């Protein structure tokens, strides 16, 4: 079946970057970062070997280790032309002078530069120089070694993709010598962020150079040595996570394949790593998931390790839950084990279907053409999402003059919108449920529209930074893809024989944002301009956000505003699948309208719309004064002359920095509208969660926008938000290992009841504690529990409440 796939973003996620079960599982994942890229990814999932590209994405400054901030080289001026030289000594000097940030640009440098910089002579000589430096490494990090190993693996990346680069056979032995020199130092297993920066490059070089077979002892050692002390350091997590890249890449290395089946110590280490209880819910949980995934992949090999592999997998499926505690590891292991082995051997057959019912348990029908399956949305969110899609549908048909007539052979009649509770949940569950990659911000699967009964799927997640009416990330943009595919483009995703990315992404941005796209105006002002001919040739290769989205938007908007009749004529061709005529049409536009396009841009930015920015706290209490500020709002070519606040409770203000008090608890959507001296306006929204004066500051107060639990296990000391449902059953392990136990609930709205038992799920006959105050503030304290498990029941009519269990606590949180 043909899939029309438009994946949003290349953001790294907590669980799988690969497809699940029906398609071959792929590589491990990387750590989730504070930023989220929200751009479209590559259409098809990667199932063949490729060297790892570029430097890993670094953490935001807010999470970066303070002592490493001086290493941020983002402002370094790079001169790749200076690297074009026949002298290896000069190249070494220039590489070390410019540093890793500039060497990183060689991954995407033009072919001419790569062919010069990565000659066999240069690779050999730099590997030898790296060996000399590595032998003298005493730990504590080294900018020089980090840069040199990055250069070496960039060379293999260039060789893989550049047909004009082919290394002579003596290059790889020299590279191996440099890796060996580093591995053999006394500092190889050091624990520090600075060391981790170098170690990361060394470990990925092992994979990129095709040396996966040579370093299995070191892989095993890292898995065995890993502990909570290592896990505290971001760069160590990033570095050691590379061992899973080695295990993944090894499947295309014959020497690796010949020996991996007998690596019993490695199989045990993978299983033990995946079963590390302290990793669950911790910052290295993604690594435990990767360990489970690579353990499952070992089932494809035969040898002495097979029994250990199966035993360790069985332990994972017994210790963790498919949907609950440790599910990231459970699902990762099930991903590969169900593909390479007999699923019945582990009792995991058809787990994907069961998982979908558990996760996407809410159903909401917007109309005969739109149905929502969601994990944890309120009725108000459902209604708001439906309303937004309904508005866009009307605006789309009006703007593109479709007559609401689908293209020929398109039998899609209802879109299914699948919404996960968070990007983390999307990362964990969307892969196995929909058989997609989740290293992105969402995905649209059209399926095969020519098949009657086909159901296209938009797969998304909630995010606090999304539209505050519904909090569904990319809803507006992605819904346009559905409409565009059904009413503008003949066939499925692979049908066009000419490039249409500029149109697909541009029209989605234009309909979703209309004339309010500050990012597009800013890309004109920063000088990163593209001609019409360049825009029309845009692909997803390289994921140039500006070119794909901003300039796609600008080209579409320009044509709609200045040449609408030409757009209508182009759509005649795309709706019939006449791609040769389509290509001739846009080529003519590029020749006729480039000068006009440039003038239009200048007119646009000379009277650019302002940018509204709200600065305020996101939570407060009833009767508490909250300060709101519009002072960070900007205008590209004038000044902001007026502001209008709507606080979401019927109150307004025209002050630039007002204060406001809310009279009742709840979630309020605050909007700010700013107007500039040219009369142009812009709007921003901000959500404020107000709790009652009796709320609990020690518990989450923003559960309206956070992930919620609808069941499963509680971890002592870790507050969680409760799902908005009548009854929730929760278990607490190891309650008999603590002398005292306190269970606290609070915040949100409504009225809940809290019950506890140490001898099974609470009912009228076995209660050991209960609390039923007015509101959500409940407290149970207990001591000397006899049994291992504690059982909690939360019931009532409530929303956005939180709960926490504390061990060795004689009183509840206040």
From Swiss-Prot:
Reactions catalysed: Digestion of native collagen in the triple helical region at Xaa-|-Gly bonds. With synthetic peptides, a preference is shown for Gly at P3 and P1', Pro and Ala at P2 and P2', and hydroxyproline, Ala or Arg at P3'
Where is it located? Secreted
Q: Tell me the active site.
A: 478
Residues that make up the propeptide are 22-75
In this record, what's one Pfam family? PKD_4
Q: Does the keyword Transmembrane apply?
A: no
Give the keywords, sorted: Collagen degradation, Hydrolase, Metal-binding, Metalloprotease, Protease, Secreted, Signal, Zinc, Zymogen
Modification after translation (UniProt): Proteolytic cleavage might yield three different active forms.
Write one Gene Ontology MF term. metalloendopeptidase activity
User: Binding residues for Zn(2+), per the UniProt record?
Assistant: 477, 481
**What SMART domains does the database record attribute to this sequence?**
PKD
Q: Which cofactor does it need?
A: Zn(2+)
Q: Superkingdom, according to UniProt?
A: Bacteria
Fetch the InterPro entries from UniProt. Ig-like_fold, Peptidase_C_arc/bac, Peptidase_M9_N_dom, Peptidase_M9A/M9B, PKD/Chitinase_dom, PKD_dom, PKD_dom_sf
**GO terms of biological process kind:** collagen catabolic process; proteolysis
Task: Using the record's annotation, list all stretches that form the PKD domain.
Answer: 609-697
Chief place where the protein resides: secreted
Main enzyme class = hydrolase
Q: Which residues form the signal peptide?
A: 1-21
Protein name, please?
Microbial collagenase
Which source organism?
Answer: Vibrio alginolyticus
């Amino acid at each position: 079946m043909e899939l029309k796939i438009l994946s949003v973003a290349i953001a790294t996620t907590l669980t799988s970057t690969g497809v699940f079960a029906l398609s071959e599982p792929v590589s491990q994942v990387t750590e989730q970062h504070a930023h989220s890229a929200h751009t479209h990814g590559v259409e098809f999932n990667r199932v063949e070997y490729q060297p790892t590209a570029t430097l890993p994405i670094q953490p935001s400054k807010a999470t970066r280790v303070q002592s490493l901030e001086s290493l941020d080289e983002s402002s370094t001026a790079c001169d790749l032309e200076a690297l074009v030289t026949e002298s290896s000594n000069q190249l070494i000097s220039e590489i070390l002078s410019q540093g890793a940030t500039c060497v990183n640009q060689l991954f995407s440098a033009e072919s001419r530069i790569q062919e010069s910089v990565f000659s066999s002579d240069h690779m050999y000589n730099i590997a030898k120089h790296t060996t000399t430096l590595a032998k003298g490494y005493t730990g504590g990090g080294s900018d020089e070694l980090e840069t040199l190993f990055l250069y070496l693996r960039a060379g293999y990346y260039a060789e893989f993709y550049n047909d004009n680069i082919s290394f002579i056979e003596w290059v790889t032995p020299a590279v191996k010598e440099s890796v060996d020199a580093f591995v053999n130092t006394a500092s190889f297993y050091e624990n520090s962020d600075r060391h981790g920066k170098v170690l990361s490059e060394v470990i990925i070089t092992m994979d990129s150079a095709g040396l996966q077979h040579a370093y299995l002892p070191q892989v095993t050692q890292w898995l065995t040595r890993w502990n909570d002390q290592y896990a505290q350091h971001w760069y160590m997590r990033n570095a050691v996570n590379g061992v899973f890249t080695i295990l993944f890449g090894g499947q295309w290395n014959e020497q690796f394949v010949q020996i991996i089946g007998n690596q019993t110590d490695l199989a045990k280490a993978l299983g033990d790593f995946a079963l590390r209880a302290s990793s669950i819910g911790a910052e290295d949980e993604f690594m435990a998931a990767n360990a489970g995934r690579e353990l499952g992949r070992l089932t494809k090999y035969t040898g002495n390790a097979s029994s250990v592999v199966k035993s360790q997998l069985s332990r994972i499926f017994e210790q963790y839950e498919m949907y609950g505690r440790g599910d990231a590891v459970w699902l990762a292991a099930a991903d590969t084990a169900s593909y390479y082995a007999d699923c019945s051997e582990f009792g995991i057959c058809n787990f994907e279907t069961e998982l979908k019912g558990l996760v996407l348990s809410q159903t909401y029908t917007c109309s005969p053409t739109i149905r929502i399956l969601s994990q944890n949305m309120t009725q108000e969110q459902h209604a708001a999402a439906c309303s937004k899609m309904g508005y866009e549908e009307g605006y789309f048909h009006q703007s593109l003059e479709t007559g609401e007539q689908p293209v020929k052979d398109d039998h899609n009649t209802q879109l299914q919108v699948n919404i996960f509770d968070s990007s983390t949940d999307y990362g964990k569950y969307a892969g196995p449920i929909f058989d997609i990659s989740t290293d992105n911000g969402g995905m649209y699967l059209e399926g095969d529209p020519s098949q009657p009964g086909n159901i296209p799927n938009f797969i998304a997640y909630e995010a606090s930074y999304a539209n505050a009416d519904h909090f569904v990330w990319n809803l507006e943009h992605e819904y346009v893809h559905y409409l565009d595919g059904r009413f503008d483009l003949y066939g499925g995703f692979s049908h066009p024989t000419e490039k249409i990315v500029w149109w697909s992404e541009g029209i989605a941005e234009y309909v979703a944002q209309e004339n309010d796209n500050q990012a597009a105006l800013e890309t004109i002002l920063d000088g990163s301009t593209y001609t019409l001919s360049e825009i029309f040739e845009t692909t997803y290769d390289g994921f140039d956000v500006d070119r794909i989205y901003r300039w796609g938007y600008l080209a579409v908007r320009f044509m709609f505003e200045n040449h609408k009749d030409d757009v209508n004529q182009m759509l005649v061709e795309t709706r019939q699948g006449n791609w040769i005529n389509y290509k001739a049409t846009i080529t003519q536009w590029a020749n006729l309208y480039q000068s006009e396009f440039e003038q239009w841009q200048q007119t646009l930015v000379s009277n650019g719309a302002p940018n509204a920015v709200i600065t305020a706290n996101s939570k407060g209490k009833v009767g508490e004064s909250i300060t709101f500020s519009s002072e960070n709002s900007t205008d590209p070519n004038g000044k902001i002359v007026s502001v209008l606040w709507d606080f979401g409770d019927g109150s307004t203000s025209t002050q630039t920095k007002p204060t406001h008090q809310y009279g009742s608890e709840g979630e309020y959507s605050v909007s700010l509208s700013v107007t500039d001296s040219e009369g142009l306006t812009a709007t921003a929204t901000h959500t404020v969660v107000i709790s009652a004066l009796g709320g609990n500051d020690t518990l989450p107060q923003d559960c309206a926008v956070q992930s919620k639990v609808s069941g499963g296990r509680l971890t002592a000391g870790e507050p969680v938000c409760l799902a908005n449902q009548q009854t929730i059953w929760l278990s607490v392990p190891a309650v008999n290992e603590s002398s005292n136990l306190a269970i606290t609930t609070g915040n949100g709205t409504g009225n809940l009841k809290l019950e506890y038992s140490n001898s099974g799920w609470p009912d009228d006959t076995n209660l050991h504690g209960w609390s039923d105050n007015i509101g959500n503030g409940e407290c149970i304290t207990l001591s000397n529990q006899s049994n291992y498990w504690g059982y909690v029941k939360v019931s009532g009519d409530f929303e956005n409440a939180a709960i926490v269990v504390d061990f060795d606590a004689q009183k509840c949180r206040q």
